[in-house]
Design a protein with these regions (language model features):
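Conserved C-terminal beta-signal and adjacent last beta-strands/turns
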Residues: 68, 79, 123, 136, ...
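Non-catalytic regulatory/gating segments with a bias toward low-complexity or hydrophobic composition
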Residues: 16-17, 36-38, 473
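Short acidic/polar hinge/loop motifs at secondary-structure boundaries
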Residues: 1-20
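Outer-membrane beta-barrel signature, preferentially recognizing the C-terminal barrel domain
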Residues: 161-179, 216, 309, 316-376, ...
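Periplasmic-side early beta-strands and strand-to-turn transitions of outer-membrane beta-barrels
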Residues: 25, 44-46, 54, 66-165
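Gram-negative outer-membrane beta-barrel transporters
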Residues: 233, 272-278, 372-374, 395-484
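Face-selective signature of the C-terminal outer-membrane beta-barrel domain
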Residues: 134-151, 167-291, 297-304, 364-371, ...
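Outer-membrane beta-barrel channels and translocator barrels
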Residues: 71-74, 136-140, 179-183, 230-234, ...
Length: 507
């Protein structure tokens, strides 16, 4: 949340690892559906400077510059990223809706569509600066400090919107890693993320600008201490603790500083019971200031038979409501719908089961997975009478809804992935993902869910002396997306194909 993905410098990404299913035992409260690990690359040379520039249609531009230095015990890693794009429309008409007298549900009424200047993607720009220093005190102890500054602002048509949005973030952190021996180390880390969102008033010709108003501020603090211990050749044990504190301030909701803290203890044991059989068992104990005690276990059993790998896993998920869900109000300007907070929300909980089989042999790999995720106390929206919201002091609006634990949900799916290395620098791959979702309260699909998704990719790379060329083709085909937010009018299916080339010169 809060634009954190936008701050990642894609030029620094070494690889991306996706962990499907609940992973709260190691990754904490928010890991109820899955985890994406983004591993960045560190320079190994004394000096390494790189620039990555991309330009596309609709004014899409990105520039990423890295400057890394290593000298003796000292290391410095600096990066800057600029992203920007023009705005564009997918449709010059604004969708109109009518209400069914019997069901009271709204439905599309294309005959009433009106011309609009609204954009599917608004013009924007962002800047991100990262700096990290490391110092190796000796062969065992390494220290590090880091910081980030990020800003983002969009530019929307004044004929439609009264304001633009502006986001600003600064982060700072410090860490230490101590190698006990070659098989064990202790890692300590502290991190702070400070986010501010503002309204930037848009003035039409002849109008005076109202300036900028702070929408909300979020302060996040995370401290952790963990140890990793290899016990012989067949076992690795991890143990640690974590403390998280969050603060929310909002001028529009008259919040001077609502706080919530969470403490956690976690442990995980990875053990090879015999040559081809491995087990991973983990547990995370959580104490939250508002939601008290909870424990999330996870178990993974894997067996290797020649080129085949089999895996079965279970994981418990747990997610506490955010401070915004507990305290903040949100108003959709286009529909004049107010969303009011709920101080009595409960934490979401889930049970995730997965079976996986994988074949890996030389130039080909194929895997198929089946899973089921059962979610309890799912936080969703419950429609309420706008008059009630007005009586509670949230103003007069056309529509109103409140966050509430109204759903039990179940997500079942099958995913198949194929990758082939054809030789001579060529590789191709593809996947198919079927997902069946159900809100057990209404017997309807989960909002925003998609049932069928196909992906395909083809890559080729070749080096001529100092010059290296990479060509990548990526495609995605997706069925329509179910949506009750937009009055049960599903977003249409689509296909998207991206062709990218990368040209590298090693001087």
């Amino acid at each position: 949340g809060d634009d954190r993905i936008s701050r990642i410098n894609v030029a620094n990404i070494k690889r991306v690892e996706i962990l499907n299913g609940a992973a709260s035992a190691l990754y904490g409260s928010d890991a109820i559906g899955g985890v994406i690990n983004i591993i960045t690359d560190d320079a190994k040379n004394v000096m390494q400077v790189s620039s990555d520039t991309r330009y596309g249609s609709k004014g899409r531009f990105s520039e990423a510059v890295n400057a890394d230095f290593n000298q003796g015990k000292f290391g410095s890693y600096t990066s800057y990223q600029r992203l920007q794009a023009d705005g564009w429309q997918l449709n010059a008409l604004e969708a109109a809706y009518a209400t069914d007298k019997e069901t009271k549900r709204k439905y599309r009424n294309p005959e009433k569509d009106k011309a609009t200047d609204k954009e599917a993607s608004t013009a924007f720009y962002s800047n991100t600066v990262n700096q990290r220093f490391t110092y190796a005190v000796n062969d065992r102890l390494t220290l590090g400090i880091r910081g980030t500054y990020y800003n983002w602002e969009n530019d929307r048509p004044a004929s439609v919107y009264k304001y633009n949005m502006e986001h600003e973030t600064y982060t700072y952190g410090a860490g230490a890693k101590y190698m006990i021996n070659k098989s064990a180390y202790i890692d300590a880390d502290f991190y702070s993320d400070n986010f501010t969102s503002r309204y930037d008033s848009v003035s039409k010709p002849g109008e005076a600008s109202r300036g900028k108003d702070t929408r909300k501020k979020v302060h996040y603090y995370n401290g952790s201490l963990k140890g990793i211990f290899k016990l012989g050749q067949a076992q690795k044990f991890s143990v640690g603790m974590e403390y998280v504190k969050e603060t929310l301030m909002s001028a529009t909701d008259d919040l001077d500083g609502e706080n919530m803290y969470t403490m956690a203890l976690f442990l995980q044991d990875e053990i090879r019971l015999w040559k081809n059989f491995q087990a991973v068992v983990g547990l995370r104990y959580i104490y939250n200031e508002f939601f008290k005690n909870y424990a999330t276990p996870n178990v993974v059993l894997s067996y290797k038979w020649g080129d085949l790998n089999f895996r079965a896993s279970y994981a418990s998920g747990f997610r506490t409501p955010t401070l915004s869900q507990l305290y903040a109000t949100d108003v959709a300007k286009t529909t004049d719908m107010v969303t009011i907070p709920n101080f009595n929300l409960k934490s979401e909980k889930s049970d995730y089961f997965m079976l996986n089989a994988e074949y890996v042999h030389n130039r080909i790999s194929f895997s198929v997975s089946g899973y089921i995720n059962k979610i309890r106390d799912m936080i969703n929206y419950r429609g309420i009478d706008p008059a009630i919201a007005e009586q509670l002091g949230y103003g007069k609006h056309n529509e109103a809804q409140q966050r509430d634990n109204i759903s039990r949900a179940e997500v079942k799916g099958v995913k198949a992935v194929l990758n082939v290395y054809a030789g001579a620098g060529f590789s191709v791959g593809g996947s198919y993902h079927f997902m069946d979702t159900e809100d057990k309260t209404t017997q309807e699909p989960i909002d925003k869910s998609v049932k069928n998704v196909w992906t395909a990719n083809a890559r080729w790379g070749h080096r001529w002396g100092l010059y290296h060329l990479n060509v990548n083709l990526n495609g995605r085909i997706q069925e329509g997306r179910y949506s009750k937010t937009y009055y049960y009018d599903p977003a249409p299916g689509f296909s998207q194909w991206d062709l990218n080339t990368r040209h590298s010169f090693n001087l």
